[in-house]
């Protein structure tokens, strides 16, 4: 069966767009898994909700405190805070980028 060139092009375009969307979602999903694994004991890791530890900021509010784009370097070098309850974490650059992608996904859409 022969398909018109337009149908082949449309099918290829659909596959490309679908593949790109899946690749874009992957870092956000990875970041969400990482924060749920390492941060959820103390922080609300969703856009809303209360943190289990009162002094731990909700991740949905981090953009109000920091430009989350700059957190990637701190996540790789190790975040150290003034309060002793927070453990020091060090992530590899891919993990840090995924966490930042997830945090950005929590910011309100303008």
Predicted regions and their residues:
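N-terminal hydrophobic targeting signals that begin at the initiator methionine
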Residues: 1-3
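Bacterial N-terminal signal peptides
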Residues: 5-18
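Electrostatic cytochrome c docking/interface patches
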Residues: 15-34
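A short, structured loop/turn motif at beta-sheet edges
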Residues: 23, 65, 93-95
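Gly/Gly-Pro-rich "capping" loops immediately C-terminal to redox-active cysteine motifs
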Residues: 28-32, 47-76
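The canonical Cys-X-X-Cys-His
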Residues: 31, 36-45, 99
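Axial heme c-ligation environment in periplasmic c-type cytochrome domains
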Residues: 53-61, 74-106
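Short, solvent-exposed mixed-charge patches
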Residues: 109-110
């Amino acid at each position: 069966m022969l398909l018109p060139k337009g149908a082949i092009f449309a099918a290829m375009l659909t596959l490309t767009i679908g593949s790109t969307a899946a690749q874009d979602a992957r870092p956000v999903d990875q970041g969400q898994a990482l924060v749920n694994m390492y941060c959820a004991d103390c922080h609300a890791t969703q856009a809303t909700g209360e943190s289990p530890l009162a002094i731990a900021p909700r991740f949905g509010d981090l953009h109000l405190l920091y430009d989350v784009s700059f957190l990637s370097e701190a996540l790789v070098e190790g975040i150290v805070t003034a309060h002793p309850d927070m453990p020091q974490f060090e992530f590899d650059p891919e993990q840090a980028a995924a966490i930042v992608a997830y945090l950005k996904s929590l910011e309100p859409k303008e």
